[in-house]
């Protein structure tokens, strides 16, 4: 039986990247919660950037 998680950077960024989250009301809510909490990574797009 195949495992359920088959990682792909492209799919991850397209689904959970910053621009994808900004498109929906719920996604913007996610970003605002993560900002309020003080997360260094707001979305999957932030994983590419060195800090």
Curated annotation (Swiss-Prot):
Belongs to the bacterial ribosomal protein bL34 family. The keyword Acyltransferase does not apply. PANTHER family: LARGE RIBOSOMAL SUBUNIT PROTEIN BL34M, MITOCHONDRIAL RIBOSOMAL PROTEIN 34 FAMILY MEMBER. Disulfide bonds: none annotated. GO terms for cellular component: ribonucleoprotein complex; ribosome. Residues 31-42 have a biased composition (Basic residues). One of its GO terms (molecular function) is structural constituent of ribosome. Residues 25-51 are annotated as: Disordered. This is Large ribosomal subunit protein bL34. The gene is rpmH. InterPro entries: Ribosomal_bL34. One of its GO terms (biological process) is translation. Coiled coil: none annotated. Keywords: Ribonucleoprotein, Ribosomal protein. It comes from Treponema denticola (strain ATCC 35405 / DSM 14222 / CIP 103919 / JCM 8153 / KCTC 15104).
